[in-house]
Structures are given as structure tokens and as C-alpha cells.
């Protein structure tokens, strides 16, 4: 169930208003999967008549949905909590930090009135009621099992025309560097019908781009149907009236020939492959507890390019993993040079307590890991620039999302750009009013390119 009222978010904070005397502010930190949980909590409170604002100055209670994936994310979460505590706010700590540290947070932050785990956010109404009665609440399940569906109220904050849809929760993989299974539990997939129902709800709200997410989207359905079921899901979504469907977190082992064929044949599925490969060298992948990947990565990428020449490839990579030698890093550099990805995100390894990687010998010094990150980014940048430059003179579809009030330019994205992580397309001022184009997918002639972004002009309108 989705609330019908929408307001543009500001600074990643959720905005709601209602007639209820109680005022609750929401602050979201972390990934888009966490964002969906935030939106469900907002929807639940809105359905009960609570007033919710992004303005923490006026709020009696602040719900902070936190991230604890890596140290940098934890530090950001802690800074936000300390800042609110210094203001004397009553705080409800939700999300991964709450799941990670549990009652320790209540002990160390007196202003924390409740902690809500990743599998417990559906109880936010009861938690808030107990807090208002003076209780300090520990609502953290040891093993998260809950997964939200289309029947759980949700208040979207991602704009009127783009929405994430979580197809599964949790993860069954045990990568050596990752703490997510501890924070989110094992994989729990939603049914195809549940996902289609929510997609149809979103289509009625005018959504133009739907982004399917989970920890490993290509493993969708294995726990529910006994085999990977993404191809079946994509074909079921072909009947949903949403022009762009994008898939994030496609692990290579799950991109079977059937899935790649579904990408090709389902008209509203974008040929955009988000592949978190992490590394290329077999020994590093083995140390990461991903030994299966080295046997499929190159062959898979070649197969995708053969079947879908227009495919857009994004990957994320980790440098400085424990024991990574110069030769292994050079192998990764050569891999990036040869594969010519459209978009690459590079991260220096973060040593996380509770992971197998934290115990490994030969930890790479921070300075070396950062230098390797910088070098890999420098290798990828001219590749990304060349990919963009090759589009000059072509006409591409652009989803218009906002207007630059200073220049009059219309700003949006082509299908090759995912929200937040990729580039954007800036179109010179048009005689057509922004309000007439907002949320529409229009043809645009690309006239210029930058490292990550494109510029152009509206070509023609039917």
C-alpha cells in the first residue's frame, strides 16, 4: 500500500505533514535498500496520523535509519546520532547500526530511547507508542526474518517518477569482506505476484523508472522456488505499464543465458548490467570467498556483449584486499582496461570486525590501498569519457527529472545512467515548459560530453 501524497525530499531527509500533535523527524543514512525500509516506517506512521518532518529542530522524536556496512558509514551514523543527542533530541535508532550493536547503543547514548533492528521496522508504530509512554525499547530480533511487501504502507521519497522495489531481503553468500548477512539475515524472496502487485501500484502513481534491488538480485527466488527466478520475474513485469525497469546487484553467477535473454526480449527491461565483480584475479577472489566468480566473469561479459551490443556495464571493485600483491592489482588494472566498462566504482578495502577478511594476514596499508584506488579510477576515467563522447550526434531517450532554475536547463538521465551513481544529461532551455516535460521520457540529441555527464537539446516531441 502506498500513500498518495508526495513531496520532494530535501537533503535525504523525509518530509511528511499531518494533523497529529506528535512530531517525528526522519533521517535516512545508507543504501537504497535501507531507504525502502525508511519509506515503510514513514508510511506506517503516516497511516496512523503522525506528523513527520525533516526539520529536527521542531521534532519531539527523531528516527535515524542507520548504516553499518563499513567503518566510514558507521562514523557517519554515529556523528548524526551524537549531533542529535547534543540537541537533546529523543532518538530512535533503526537499521543496520542498531542490528550490529544492539543494546550497546542504549547503554552508550542516553538520548537513544529505542533501537529497531533491520527485521523489526514494521513495528515502528508500537515502538513509538512505548517511547512516548516513557519506555526504552529494544526491538531487535537476533535473526531478521521479516520482509516488507506491497501491503505494508510506504511513503516514497525518491521523486514522483522513480522508485526502488525490493524483491528480496538478506543474503546467503558469505563473502569474506562483508557483514551484510549478519545485519540482514539470510535471503528471503517475495513472490512474483507480490512484486508485480507493487509494480502495478507504482505504475498507477506515474512511475517511469522502476529499480529492482536486493542484496543479490540475480539470486532472487532461490529460497522460494528452488532455483533462480529472475528471468520469470522479468517476463512477468513485462505487462506492467512502466517504461524503464532497471536491475541492480546482478551477480555474475546468476546471469544465466535465460536471464540475459530476458534482458534482451522484455521490452521495458533496460540493458543495464550492474555487476559487483569486486576483483578479477582468481587468488584474490578465492580469498574473498568468491572462487566461483573467476570462472564466469570474462565469459559472461563477452556473452552479454555478443547478445546485447547496446548493453551498459557498471561494476564495483575493491582494491587493497588483504594479501593483494602488486601483480594481482596489475591484473585488475589490465582487466578494467580490456573490458571497458561504462561505469566503475572503486573502493579501498575496509577492515570490518566480525568478517573473515579482518582476520586475514598481510593487511594492505591504507596508503597503498588509496593509491591503488586512485590509479584504477585514473584508468577508468578516459574510458568513461570516450563512451560518452561516442554518443555525440546520437538521439537518446531522456527522463526529465528537474530544472536548473539558474540556467533554464532541463536535467535528466538517459537509460545508461542510474540514479545517484552515474551521470546525468543536461538539455539546453526549451520553448516547452518544464511542467509539461517533468517526468516524461523525451528524445534528445546529444551535442556534448564531459567525463561523466552529457549535454544536448530536445530533438522533437510527438
From Swiss-Prot:
The record, for SUPFAM superfamilies, names:
Radical SAM enzymes
GO MF annotation terms: 4 iron, 4 sulfur cluster binding; aspartic acid methylthiotransferase activity; metal ion binding; protein methylthiotransferase activity
Please name the source species: Prochlorococcus marinus (strain MIT 9211)
For this UniProt record, give its keywords in alphabetical order, as a comma-separated list.
4Fe-4S, Cytoplasm, Iron, Iron-sulfur, Metal-binding, S-adenosyl-L-methionine, Transferase
**Needed cofactors:** [4Fe-4S] cluster
As recorded in Swiss-Prot or TrEMBL, the protein's gene is named: rimO
Task: Give the TRAM domain ranges.
Answer: 389-460
Localization, per the record, is: Cytoplasm
Classification from the root reads: Bacteria, Bacillati, Cyanobacteriota, Cyanophyceae, Synechococcales
The signal peptide annotation in the UniProt record is: none
Binding residue positions for [4Fe-4S] cluster 2: 171, 175, 178
UniProt protein name: Ribosomal protein uS12 methylthiotransferase RimO
What is the catalytic activity of this protein? L-aspartate(89)-[ribosomal protein uS12]-hydrogen + (sulfur carrier)-SH + AH2 + 2 S-adenosyl-L-methionine = 3-methylsulfanyl-L-aspartate(89)-[ribosomal protein uS12]-hydrogen + (sulfur carrier)-H + 5'-deoxyadenosine + L-methionine + A + S-adenosyl-L-homocysteine + 2 H(+)
Question: What remark does the entry make about the cofactor?
Answer: Binds 2 [4Fe-4S] clusters. One cluster is coordinated with 3 cysteines and an exchangeable S-adenosyl-L-methionine.
